[in-house]
Amino acid sequence: VPGGFGAAKNLSSFAAEGSECQVDRDLQALALAMHQAGKPLGFMCIAPALLPKIFAFPLRITIGTDLDTADVVEEMGAEHVPCPVDDIVVDEENKVVTTPAYMLAENIAQAATGIEKLVARVLALSA
């Protein structure tokens, strides 16, 4: 799931409501169905902040190193793991992969490194 303001405003109400946000019903249904089928999920940028609202159990996720946003996702029930722009955090048990992308990236090359790792890990978890 890509991040950016679209995830925070259109796929959820996170931008306006923070920890009290609602997640788009279709996104929530898709994510839950994929998880129940044992399929891996990849969320990037601010999109991982939606995961605690989608799932009723704690997940290991990252939004990078922004302490204010990390506090919000932990308040929502996630375990936030600080992560550099070029890396990923994997919740092995739940097959969820996250990367900070533009939460930290200053250019597309920086974002691409973490995103490419996310895609590779999601594909590996699919096998």
Model-found features: residue ranges?
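Active-site-adjacent pocket-lining segments in enzyme domains
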Residues: 1-127
